[in-house]
Amino acid sequence: MNFFMEKNKDAGHRVTIKIPKTTVNNSLLQEFIKIRKTTKINGFRKGKTPIRVIQEKYGSAIYYDIFKKLMQKFFYEFIKTEKIKIIGSPKFYIHQDEDKKKEYFEYSVIYELYPQFQIKDIKQIKVNKINVEITEEDIKKNIETNKNKKNIWNPVNKAVKSYDRVTINYCIYEKNKKIKKFDKDNISFIVSKNTLIPQLNYKIINHFVNDIIFFKIKFHAFHPEKELQNKDITFKIKIIKIEKKQELESEKSNKKNITEKKTIQTDYQTIKNNLHSQINIITDKYLENQIIQKIVEKNILLLPPLLFQKEIKNLYKQYTKQYQEENSNILEKKYHMSLDSEVKKRLYFQIIIEQIILNNKLFADENNIQKLIKKISSNYKNPMEIIKLYNKNKNLKNTMKNIELERQAMLLLKKSIKIEKQNWNFERFLNYNWASHEELML
């Protein structure tokens, strides 16, 4: 196979490949023979139709299919030989066969390479690891906060304040034209403690029942509602009800009996374990994010536009599916945020981890994978069903394999960099602005 490689400024990488005409003609002949065996044409017995007649009847369509298959076959042989990792779908271009005397057909393929990346100065990277100390008093406070209480919401005739529960109706307009399909009634939420857009929270403060509020927002280009994408939408909000919370001890929690101490002890241990588990997940993720961020700061890592757009589309599909499955509200904050930062974060992590795996020739340890499966399955009512599912499902096996490889790669990174420990108390952990690291929150 003959090929010629070049790099275009705008079109990415390009390779020109030559396919011998004898290869094309032989493939065509084999296809014509297959058709003759299975197709009956008027005037000829089945299997006896002359190749010339088959060629005249089916030639154009078959030639296109055969040449398409050969172009793909030769191109993927080329990337295998050159050990090239491509992104997305390559674009094929057939050259005009002006010189009939040539012994080959010529075509070009434009493709984008997966970024090549070398990690430098890894030992110079410094990050902070947060260690959180939880005291018995912290756990007792947590039990007290989460023990069985009955919340009563009492309607009030006062202005809306933070942490009030508010019920609203709303409708939306584009260029003063109402879009009726998005009308919503009786939407309740707790002010300043919800997952809705910030504009709603601060616009509604200090208003009263029956007040009508207007505000305008521009919907994101990747909002799940295609009809609203990139549009300036005006919301008309009417406040239906304002309520304030009153906490009451339930009858159950007021009963003092012999079993209460056992229950408290059980709650104590469960809450202690849960707190440690959640804190470890959040602080480990925080540490890993620092590592990736520091590596990107010290090393030039350019994300190919094709790879970036591909990941944007994947994330948009995930968001749209989630939006539909959860029957989400158009006011949900996460659907109004740019996908760019999340996509960059994902791709940086993916590229760096893959480079660590490649450089260190890491392989998935089956024993560790089995431990991981057992750990995951223990969270389900029927652990054996999860284990059986893993053994049967190829995609799940690949996912577990990738998780194990990522774990090994991240462990190597942690051993290579400088980690400075920071000791926090539980209160500092709770009051830290984790909102700037929303992906960490469980």
Swiss-Prot record:
Entry keyword annotation includes Cell membrane: no
A GO CC annotation given for this chain: cytoplasm
Disulfide bonds: none
EC number: 5.2.1.8
Keyword Cell cycle (UniProt): yes
Occurrences of domain PPIase FKBP-type (ranges): 163-248
Molecular functions per Gene Ontology: peptidyl-prolyl cis-trans isomerase activity
Subcellular location: Cytoplasm
Domain of life: Bacteria
Annotated InterPro entries: PPIase_dom_sf, Trig_fac, Trigger_fac_C, Trigger_fac_C_sf, Trigger_fac_ribosome-bd_bac, Trigger_fac_ribosome-bd_sf, Trigger_fact/SurA_dom_sf
Membership in a protein family: Belongs to the FKBP-type PPIase family. Tig subfamily.
Function: Involved in protein export. Acts as a chaperone by maintaining the newly synthesized protein in an open conformation. Functions as a peptidyl-prolyl cis-trans isomerase.
Protein name as annotated: Trigger factor
Organism: Buchnera aphidicola subsp. Acyrthosiphon pisum (strain 5A)
